[in-house]
Amino acid sequence: MECVIGVVGRDFAVVAADTSAVQSILVHKTDEDKVMVLDSHKLMGASGEPGDRVQFTEFIQKNLHLYQFRNNIPLSTAATANFTRGELATALRKNPYYVNVLLAGYDSDVGASLYYIDYIATFHKIEKGAFGYGSYFCLSLMDKLYRPDMSVEEAVDLVDKCIKEIRLRLVVAPQNFIIKIVDKEGAREYARRAYTDSPPEAATSEAATVAA
């Protein structure tokens, strides 16, 4: 029941993900951070098999650090996305990773950007996206409510609406979520959402209209 959400706003990008580590019917932990800070201005939200997810995101992170160490300059977000896509495509023909990625970053020359890369190395630059079962509900909400000029508060509010809809619609919904942001100030954690009560009785009027 993994859920990863990404949104690009006005000179920033937001990536959110659930924090549940689940296998079959068991919940192993509820504080698993699935949004990795790759470097000072890049975030990678990932879903998929836990072992593949952890190994692949750490592999990308260490290679970015190695490139910067050797060349004294960081990779751009676009270059990082192409490198990530290339590694998934190469592994697909050998020992594939079952990992889906939303890569967000900020570059001084182009601003914030978000890239969609799935486990078969499909690659797109997008403004909004989601992976996991939650994407069935988030994508319709974002189609209705998303605007390219959103402020940070508006983007986080949209993410919160997506989370509420996920918790309303999924039979077994994640309880905890983490939200991170990247902008000219860098990549950092913005907020956490923890729900210990029962799922909401109804979504917001906008969410209910879209999901109906």
UniProtKB/Swiss-Prot annotation:
Q: Where in the cell is it found?
A: Cytoplasm; Nucleus
Complex formation:
The 26S proteasome consists of a 20S proteasome core and two 19S regulatory subunits. The 20S proteasome core is composed of 28 subunits that are arranged in four stacked rings, resulting in a barrel-shaped structure. The two end rings are each formed by seven alpha subunits, and the two central rings are each formed by seven beta subunits. The catalytic chamber with the active sites is on the inside of the barrel.
Classification of source organism = Eukaryota, Viridiplantae, Streptophyta, Embryophyta, Tracheophyta
Its source organism is Oryza sativa subsp. japonica (Rice)
Q: Does the keyword Nucleus apply?
A: yes
The superkingdom of the source organism is: Eukaryota
Keyword Membrane on this protein? no
What Gene Ontology cellular-component terms does the record carry?
Answer: cytosol; nucleus; proteasome core complex, beta-subunit complex
Q: What InterPro entries is this protein classified in?
A: Ntn_hydrolases_N, Proteasome_alpha, Proteasome_beta2, Proteasome_bsu_CS, Proteasome_sua/b, Proteasome_suB-type
* SUPFAM superfamilies xref list: N-terminal nucleophile aminohydrolases (Ntn hydrolases)
> Would you identify the family this protein belongs to, as annotated?
Belongs to the peptidase T1B family.
GO BP field: proteasome-mediated ubiquitin-dependent protein catabolic process
The name on file for this protein is Proteasome subunit beta type-2
Q: What does this protein do?
A: Non-catalytic component of the proteasome, a multicatalytic proteinase complex which is characterized by its ability to cleave peptides with Arg, Phe, Tyr, Leu, and Glu adjacent to the leaving group at neutral or slightly basic pH. The proteasome has an ATP-dependent proteolytic activity.
Main localization is cytoplasm
